[in-house]
């Protein structure tokens, strides 16, 4: 029962998938971050369904672009937009954290979101779906969430409130770190075995950059910054996927 509730907590928080209502407590939140990658598995499965449907190329590209948004309800995009506004302000740490709390959408958020979807749609249109490509992308979507959850359990927090702090405080951080670190290594190995080593390399490099930006700019991570990392990693992994196909490596 606790296992199912733990999975339900992860899907309730990190997706738009309807789940039964129940009280969140210490027991069912302790390992919720370990279940976070399952949302990536669902995104990947639906992405593959979109790939095999007899759709016109533009509709398929739009599906590739929108499936993760529909599954997650845009929660990570919201963090991406807020973080783009904060980082583009070039203010001090307190100013950036204040911008992250502002519910309004600034000009830089709009510009970056438009640029993000333009780039994503363009790359998605270049993807030639095959079972191998579907498997690679599913692994990539799981990996980015494993790394995101690992960061929440391992990186310092920028503040003592908010989504990231709530899940970090409720988690058995040592166990979560160990589980997600092992999962990330296994996913990278699987990507490498399927010819997607470039995707794994991009994810790891962005994970290290994420830590640098979080510590240098904000003093730690926030829920918004976690969303920024996930969206950025997703877009940047799609680029080498396309490049490997163009180069005949997939």
Predicted regions and their residues:
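Membrane-proximal soluble regions of multi-pass membrane proteins
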Residues: 1-24
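N-terminal beta-alpha supersecondary unit
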Residues: 9-12, 26-51, 165-169
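C-terminal ends of transmembrane helices
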Residues: 18-23, 75, 95, 149-159, ...
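Multi-pass membrane catalytic core of lipid/isoprenoid biosynthesis enzymes
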Residues: 29-47, 86-132, 136-137, 175-191, ...
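Membrane-embedded alpha-helical segments that form the functional core of polytopic membrane enzymes
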Residues: 34-84, 135-139, 196-216
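Alpha-helical membrane-inserting segments
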Residues: 46-54, 67, 71, 123-127, ...
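Acidic (Asp/Glu-rich) catalytic motifs at the cytosolic membrane interface
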Residues: 67-105, 212-233
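Solvent-exposed interhelical
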Residues: 146-180, 218-222
């Amino acid at each position: 029962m606790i296992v199912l509730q733990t999975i339900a907590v992860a899907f309730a928080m990190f997706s738009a998938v309807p789940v039964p209502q129940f009280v969140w407590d210490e027991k069912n939140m302790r390992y919720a971050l370990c279940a976070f990658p399952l949302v990536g598995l669902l995104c990947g499965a639906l992405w593959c369904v979109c790939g095999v449907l007899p759709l016109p190329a533009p509709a398929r590209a739009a599906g590739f672009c929108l499936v993760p948004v529909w599954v997650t309800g845009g929660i990570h995009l919201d963090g991406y937009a807020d973080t783009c506004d904060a980082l583009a302000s070039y203010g001090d740490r307190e100013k950036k954290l204040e911008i992250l709390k502002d519910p309004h959408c600034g000009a830089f958020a709009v510009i970056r979101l438009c640029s993000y979807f333009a780039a994503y749609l363009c790359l998605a249109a270049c993807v030639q779906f095959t079972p191998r490509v579907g498997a690679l992308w599913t692994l990539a979507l799981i990996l980015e969430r494993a790394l995101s959850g690992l960061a929440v359990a391992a990186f310092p927090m920028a503040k003592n409130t908010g989504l990231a702090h709530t899940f970090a405080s409720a988690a058995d951080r040592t166990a979560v770190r160990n589980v997600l670190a092992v999962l990330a290594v296994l996913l990278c190995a699987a990507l490498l075995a399927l010819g997607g080593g470039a995707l794994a390399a991009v994810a790891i490099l962005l994970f290290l950059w994420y830590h640098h930006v979080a510590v240098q700019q904000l003093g730690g991570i926030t829920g918004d910054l976690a969303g920024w990392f996930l969206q950025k990693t997703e877009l940047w992994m799609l680029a080498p996927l396309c490049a490997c196909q163009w180069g005949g490596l997939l």
